[in-house]
């Protein structure tokens, strides 16, 4: 088979892989090949042009969460004078899925056009795997023994194959779905269990809760003590209260031991505690794993660390001409991070000024109902890195919810600082529009803003965000790792 020659071969057409390919082809006039298994979203492989984010991640999920929020908006509108016949209201799940599918397909098509219209950029449909450090095979399937469709020779290889939902090895796992399949359910489940305490489980619990039938019940189980491990503890506690107030059943310290299929098609879940419950749908959302299995990395000697491709701060692997970005590296599994890593890598490889991605102070969100916005360190981490940490905390009922009837919807804002110089180390928000607010806050943290910069800024009134400009007095401190309400002057 005759080989095709490229300057760069990218395995994976996700956000990071496409950014790298586009930049290399347009900014540096390189000949670039991109390999992926599917061009448009949906089964059997789910991920297609645009990767997880576009097809079975951020984009469709945000659309579905937006749809789910209308349930509460309609209920709350009565407090503002709106009257309507509630008996005629019904949620059309099929329409939600249809418009979601159309939106995702439009993005898929835009990437198809990019390949068609960009000189030097070529797409190959199939499974990419390494034959050597300079040769990538495009195969018919994931099976390393499957037929080779194309043989690509290249000076540089970029691994951008992303991640995949992790499914636990328990009896009956074949009766469960992952988040991939959840985007294509023909109808909303009546009794659903989302397994896991991370953002995917929490977000889908909110979606299912809004669209469930009237006699439906959403249950979330998590093996730990509180959902959203690694996030600010105050936000975790308050979100748990609000999810419960919205009717979601949260079971902590519970983990499925086995799943059995009942005669009526429902699933019987036996938990490790011995508890047994029946559900119509069980969705596993216990994390994602770097997608390295089918890459045949051993053929080029590429090393793995903690399940992901091992890279340095410039996204270089241990093999001089092979690089990796995004989820497959198991660093920060966020789309904007992968895009930034891609742009930096292409400049490093083909440009004259090597640069790297700063993985600190990355703003992110959980699109739960209500949502979370977060950037920087949580107090438990900050207190171990800095001698004295000051924590500013505020919680309140937003103006609209004094009228909407949802007074339980507390907005929480927390600012964490290095007390010695006032530098803001972290900001954590829970409540309406928190993800939108945190983006601007992220810029502040990148500029090393101090708490005085926050409270010397005039806020926009009336908004929840203005609370960030009003917090002048610490609520409590950490001194050498110990939490204190009012430490002595000497200790500060």
Curated annotation (Swiss-Prot):
PROSITE patterns: PYRIDINE_REDOX_1
Cofactor binding description: Binds 1 FAD per subunit.
Active site: 461 (proton acceptor)
Gene Ontology, cellular component aspect: cytosol; mitochondrion
Disulfide bonds: 53-58
InterPro entries per record: FAD/NAD-bd_sf, FAD/NAD-binding_dom, FAD/NAD-linked_Rdtase_dimer_sf, GSHR/TRXR-like, Pyr_nuc-diS_OxRdtase, Pyr_nucl-diS_OxRdtase_dimer, Pyr_OxRdtase_I_AS, Trypnth_redctse
MF terms in GO: flavin adenine dinucleotide binding; glutathione-disulfide reductase (NADPH) activity; trypanothione-disulfide reductase (NADPH) activity
One of the GO biological process terms: glutathione metabolic process
Matches recorded under Gene3D superfamilies: 3.30.390.30, FAD/NAD(P)-binding domain
Phenotype when changing residue 156 to H: In strain: Silvio
Domain of life: Eukaryota
Record key words, sorted: Cytoplasm, Disulfide bond, FAD, Flavoprotein, NADP, Oxidoreductase, Redox-active center
Function: Trypanothione is the parasite analog of glutathione; this enzyme is the equivalent of glutathione reductase.
PANTHER family documented for this protein: GLUTATHIONE REDUCTASE (PTHR42737:SF2)
Protein name as catalogued: Trypanothione reductase
High-level lineage: Eukaryota, Discoba, Euglenozoa, Kinetoplastea, Metakinetoplastina
